[in-house]
């Protein structure tokens, strides 16, 4: 006969397949957002603090992020309407090149400057070279 009160001694765990089946039936909590360009996207309840860029426009899904991207008088952060100076100037030394590929130094042929100080490297025996390769 089964006890009337649940006890940890008499508890059987629900099989994982049953848990997965129940989780699949659960409705996905998400919100549909329509954009000005005619596109729409869905925001999952757990992803509400992430933004993205679509067709050159940054879209935000959180109130904190909207505060940073609001412009003009709507912005709670920038209520001062005076003329602002540019914070990052295009001066020599700043990386303001249009291409994002950074040039790599050319590989040189010969000994490196690190080995220039060692004299007598030609005098190493085969056992010395085997030891150094094993390190």
Curated annotation (Swiss-Prot):
Phosphorylated. InterPro entries: Gemini_AL2 (IPR000942). One of its GO terms (cellular component) is viral capsid. Coiled coil: none annotated. GO terms for molecular function: DNA binding; structural molecule activity; zinc ion binding. GO terms for biological process: symbiont-mediated suppression of host innate immune response. Its main location: host cell. Residues 120-135 are annotated as: Transactivation. A zinc finger (unnamed) spans 37-54. Residues 77-115 are annotated as: Disordered. Keywords: Activator, DNA-binding, Host cytoplasm, Host nucleus, Host-virus interaction, Inhibition of host innate immune response by virus, Metal-binding, Phosphoprotein, Suppressor of RNA silencing, Viral immunoevasion, Zinc, Zinc-finger. Strong activator of the late viral genes promoters. Enhances the expression of the capsid protein and nuclear shuttle protein. Acts as a suppressor of RNA-mediated gene silencing, also known as post-transcriptional gene silencing (PTGS), a mechanism of plant viral defense that limits the accumulation of viral RNAs. Suppresses the host RNA silencing by inhibiting adenosine kinase 2 (ADK2), a kinase involved in a general methylation pathway. Monomer. Homodimer. Homooligomer. Self-interaction correlates with nuclear localization and efficient activation of transcription. Monomers suppress local silencing by interacting with and inactivating host adenosine kinase 2 (ADK2) in the cytoplasm. Interacts with and inhibits host SNF1 kinase. Binds to ssDNA. The zinc finger and the transactivation region are involved in PTGS suppression. Belongs to the geminiviridae transcriptional activator protein family. This is Transcriptional activator protein. It comes from Indian cassava mosaic virus (ICMV). The lineage of its organism: Viruses, Monodnaviria, Shotokuvirae, Cressdnaviricota, Repensiviricetes.
């Amino acid at each position: 006969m089964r006890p009337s009160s649940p006890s940890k001694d008499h508890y059987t765990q629900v099989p994982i397949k049953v848990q997965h089946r129940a989780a699949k039936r659960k409705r996905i909590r998400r919100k549909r957002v329509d954009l000005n360009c005619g596109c729409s996207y869905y925001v999952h309840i757990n992803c509400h603090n992430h933004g993205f860029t679509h067709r050159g426009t940054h879209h935000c899904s959180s109130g904190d992020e909207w505060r940073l991207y609001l412009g003009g008088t709507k912005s709670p952060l920038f209520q001062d309407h005076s003329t602002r100076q540019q914070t990052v100037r295009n001066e020599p030394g700043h990386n303001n090149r249009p291409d994002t590929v950074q040039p790599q130094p050319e590989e040189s042929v010969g000994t490196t400057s690190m080995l220039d100080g060692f004299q007598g490297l030609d005098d190493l025996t085969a056992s010395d070279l085997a030891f150094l390769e094993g390190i």
